[in-house]
């Protein structure tokens, strides 16, 4: 029996399928396209911080975010379903694809929200949500993004260490394939305002007006 908190190997991962999932393309909150590529001057990044319902809402509320969507990344199975991801047999984590304007929302500020609003020290879980699909992750699209992410991780780790907290387990990797989640997961908490939100930070925050 597979331990859902142990990463599956590529050899043992589910085979998936060649056909991509069809989703409604219109963002339920702001009307943007979910599938459009970033336009000139915009950037994208993939963020995993536990259940993607609450994480997506966090980011669509930030000024400077153009669009958000939720999906699966970081694993092996092509075009997985939600049920397959929850089985722990795909290797994917739940992520939010954030398209943002770095002139209005610098990546450092986006990552401030990331570090402060979940617990990045919990390994293959987030709160009561357990499994490799809930691991903390930042998947970057450029070397500049990777360097900023690593620097912000080091800065937040210093704050955690000063308060005798555990080490960060967030994986920071180049972005691989991103597979959109089913339409009912997109902007879930806007469609279901009383729905589940598992976000919960450590209580450790960057000093106000500090730079990462």
Swiss-Prot record:
Q: Tell me one Pfam family matched here.
A: PMSR
- Give the E.C. number(s): 1.8.4.11
Q: Has keyword Membrane?
A: no
The UniProt entry annotates the active site at 51
InterPro entries per UniProt: Met_Sox_Rdtase_MsrA_dom, Met_Sox_Rdtase_MsrA_sf, MsrA_MetSO_reductase
Query: Which superkingdom does the taxonomy of this entry point to?
Result: Bacteria
Oxidoreductase among the record's keywords? yes
Single GO MF descriptor: peptide-methionine (S)-S-oxide reductase activity
Give the catalytic activity.
L-methionyl-[protein] + [thioredoxin]-disulfide + H2O = L-methionyl-(S)-S-oxide-[protein] + [thioredoxin]-dithiol; [thioredoxin]-disulfide + L-methionine + H2O = L-methionine (S)-S-oxide + [thioredoxin]-dithiol
Which GO terms of type biological process are on file? cellular response to oxidative stress; protein modification process
Q: List keywords of the entry alphabetically.
A: Oxidoreductase
Name the GO cellular-component terms: cytoplasm
Record function comment: Has an important function as a repair enzyme for proteins that have been inactivated by oxidation. Catalyzes the reversible oxidation-reduction of methionine sulfoxide in proteins to methionine.
Family indicated by similarity = Belongs to the MsrA Met sulfoxide reductase family.
The identity of this protein, by name, is Peptide methionine sulfoxide reductase MsrA
Q: Please name the source species.
A: Vibrio cholerae serotype O1 (strain ATCC 39315 / El Tor Inaba N16961)
